[in-house]
């Protein structure tokens, strides 16, 4: 299982993202030498451990294997000391019944999280747009600490989700985002801005263009789009 100790070691961060890309692409032929996600409608998930360096607290993120979307996470409830499985409100009905097959060491199923998994709802609950949200190691550490073992609010869950999605899944999809985290987010924080969110919003379309251009040749891509780390199955 890919694991990242959330600190300022950029080489380990890159290695973590490479192993995550390979995990998403396992069993699917590469296209243009880029890993490709699983076929849609399969019931598989990719789990990732985020570990805080100063106390070894661990949050396990669960991403759908077919599209790298975050569906929930596991942490340890500070009141009961039990590992709890947490799913977003829009995923809860479909996934809560099989939480033990997703988070195999979870001891309890928590109620649905107070937000949905969509960027729209997460931004509303966090009270900040993705463009203006601070990304970086210290931002992720702070957001992690605000949810780990705590009583969940829409705000603390949404902020943690927005930061971890962009620094994990979106950075796996786009090496340009990985580079931005390494260059601007290891020792300070930065706002994603419009260039990053434009890439995030168009991953499906860019993936489709890659599939076509790798078969037929040609294809026009921006410098940022050229640095693709993971393709959506086509």
UniProtKB/Swiss-Prot annotation:
Gene3D superfamilies named among the record's database cross-references: Ricin (A subunit), domain 1 (3.40.420.10), Ricin (A Subunit), domain 2 (4.10.470.10)
GO MF, one example: RNA glycosylase activity
Family annotation (PROSITE patterns): SHIGA_RICIN
A Pfam family that the UniProt record links to this protein: RIP
Domain of life: Eukaryota
Keywords: Disulfide bond, Hydrolase, Plant defense, Protein synthesis inhibitor, Toxin
Claim: Calcium is one of the keywords in the record: no
Active site (UniProt): 170
Family of the protein in this entry: Belongs to the ribosome-inactivating protein family. Type 1 RIP subfamily.
Subunit (UniProt): Monomer.
Function statement: Ribosome-inactivating protein of type 1, inhibits protein synthesis in animal cells. Inhibits cell-free translation in rabbit reticulocyte lysate system with an IC(50) of 0.17 nM.
Record's protein name: Ribosome-inactivating protein lychnin
Source organism: Silene chalcedonica (Maltese-cross)
């Amino acid at each position: 299982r890919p694991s990242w100790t959330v600190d300022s070691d950029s080489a380990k961060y890159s290695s973590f993202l490479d192993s995550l890309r390979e995990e998403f692409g396992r069993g699917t032929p590469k296209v243009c030498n880029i890993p490709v996600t699983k076929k849609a409608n399969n019931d598989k998930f990719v789990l990732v451990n985020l570990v805080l360096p100063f106390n070894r607290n661990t949050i396990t993120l669960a991403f759908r294997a077919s599209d790298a979307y975050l569906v929930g996470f596991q942490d340890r409830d500070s009141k009961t000391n039990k590992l709890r499985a947490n799913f977003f409100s829009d995923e809860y009905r479909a996934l809560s019944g099989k939480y033990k097959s997703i988070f195999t060491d979870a001891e309890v199923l928590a109620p649905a999280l107070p937000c949905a998994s969509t960027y729209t709802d997460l931004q509303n609950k966090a009270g900040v747009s993705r463009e203006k949200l601070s990304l970086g190691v210290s931002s992720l550490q702070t957001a992690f600490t605000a949810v780990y073992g705590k009583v969940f609010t829409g705000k603390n869950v949404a902020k943690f989700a927005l930061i971890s999605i962009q620094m994990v899944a979106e950075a796996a999809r786009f090496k340009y985002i990985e580079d931005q985290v390494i260059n601007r987010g290891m020792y300070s924080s930065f706002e994603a801005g419009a260039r990053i969110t434009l890439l995030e919003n168009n991953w499906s379309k860019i993936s489709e263009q890659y599939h076509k251009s790798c078969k037929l040749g040609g294809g026009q891509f921006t410098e940022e789009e050229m640095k693709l780390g993971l393709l959506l199955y086509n």
